[in-house]
Amino acid sequence: MVYESGNKPGPENPTFSSDLSLSDSLVKLKKKPCEVCGSDANELLMMTCFMCRDTREHTYCARVMFQRVPRLWICEECRDFSSVANKTANAQSSRTIQVEQVVVKQVRIDQTVPSPRTNQVVDNHQDPPIDQTDPSSTTIQVVDNENLIEAAPSSRSNQVVDNKDWIEAAPSLRSNQVVPVAPRIHEFTTDESSSPVSPCSLDDETNLFHFKYPSLSLPPLMKN
């Protein structure tokens, strides 16, 4: 057999050596044992991790048993790492969503609550307040007060008139209750004389009772 280059493939040829090293690396990669059982047998049932390309397991040695080698298989270490990364990403996304919701609420509040400056501008369109120091406004106020005083009668005077009418119309209750009482004179007899003696008499001018006793006789209550 004649070669065009004129050199036979051998250890001295660099092309041959590179091809040999590549084939050796492929053999070593294929010969890596199973991570579970440690055997490199049954190469057709050996699964290689799609992410790390380092972990190898048999279909019957994996935690979940497979009937055949799947197209994409991920080892447990890569799966745990991806789950942690997903949790971190989900937490960050949820936090971002919460911050966005807070910002949206603040924007809505700012839009719904009117500005006090705006209210002040709207209120300025109303009639200006009356200046108390202005003489024209003071004169108008005095005239209005006088008109009110002249137009409206005094409620106090009306009340006095009503009270007088009531006093004249209604008789006095105290005068109706006074009943004339006739004075009574009690007569007492003494041992000295059998004639009746009036020890007390009613004075018409002062309406007081005066007790009158004989000079030698004692009052009835003080006799022994």
Curated annotation (Swiss-Prot):
A zinc finger (PHD-type) spans 31-81. Disruption phenotype: No obvious developmental defects. Plants missing all PHD finger-containing proteins (e.g. PHD1, PAIPP2/PHD2, AIPP2/PHD3, PHD4, PHD5 and PHD6) exhibit an increased expression of flowering genes leading to an early flowering phenotype under long-day conditions as well as growth retardation. Zn(2+) 2 binds at residues 49, 52, 75, 78. It comes from the Eukaryota. Keywords: Metal-binding, Transcription, Transcription regulation, Zinc, Zinc-finger. Residues 116-137 are annotated as: Disordered. One of its GO terms (molecular function) is histone reader activity. The keyword Disulfide bond does not apply. Gene3D superfamilies: Zinc/RING finger domain, C3HC4 (zinc finger). Zn(2+) 1 binds at residues 34, 37, 58, 61. GO terms for biological process: negative regulation of transcription elongation by RNA polymerase II. Interacts directly with AIPP3/BDT1. Together with AIPP3/BDT1, cooperates to form a BAH-PHD bivalent histone reader complex able to read histone H3 lysine 27 trimethylation (H3K27me3) histone marks in order to regulate transcription, especially to prevent early flowering; promotes AIPP3/BDT1 binding to H3K27me3. This is PHD finger-containing protein 5.
